[in-house]
């Protein structure tokens, strides 16, 4: 409804780039939350945002992949789309064809810095879990093992006498971690 309101930051999570804000307002419009687990590759999606300050812009595309991990990122099971995401779109909703929010547009993957058809959204169930933890504990807790894992390539498979290069090798156990104590 285009109202602008003051907000208090309750908590933030750097890994997912999700923040929980508190506002004082009545009669706010609501969106329906969808289930990103039932998404299929090829399904249509719609992103809404304010690219370059152009308010209420919508761009459409399809789901390109699910549970996508990005290089050099802590694991978040991103929804990959080909929706045009530009500066100002991040943080906006990603809708399914039923008008339900299934994700939060997060980032693009680009060598040039511009849109190249690779956009990523945080699944809404992941974002909602982050929000619940921020609300309940003021922070997000994540489990960790404390190991460095290495993919088994052909050379490692041969060195260890494996029939084929598959799986992972625990390359290092970090000190004073759950793995170290186990």
Segments and roles (model prediction):
Residues 1-181:
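Serine-dependent protease modules
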């Amino acid at each position: 409804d285009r109202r602008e309101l003051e907000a208090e930051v309750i908590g933030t999570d750097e890994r997912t780039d999700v923040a929980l804000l508190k506002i004082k307002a009545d009669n706010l419009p609501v969106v329906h939350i969808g289930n990103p687990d039932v998404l299929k590759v090829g399904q249509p999606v719609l992103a809404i945002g304010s690219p370059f300050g152009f308010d209420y812009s919508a761009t459409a595309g399809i789901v390109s992949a699910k549970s996508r991990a990005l290089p050099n990122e802590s694991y978040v099971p991103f929804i990959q789309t080909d929706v045009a995401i530009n500066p100002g779109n991040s943080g906006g909703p990603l809708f399914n064809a039923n008008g339900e929010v299934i994700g939060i547009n997060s980032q693009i993957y680009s060598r040039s810095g511009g849109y190249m058809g690779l956009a990523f959204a945080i699944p809404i169930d992941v974002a909602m879990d982050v929000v619940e933890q921020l609300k309940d504990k003021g922070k997000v807790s994540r489990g960790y093992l404390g190991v460095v894992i290495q993919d088994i390539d052909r050379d490692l498979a041969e060195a260890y006498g494996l029939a084929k290069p598959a799986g992972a090798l625990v390359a290092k156990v970090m000190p004073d971690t759950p793995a170290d104590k186990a």
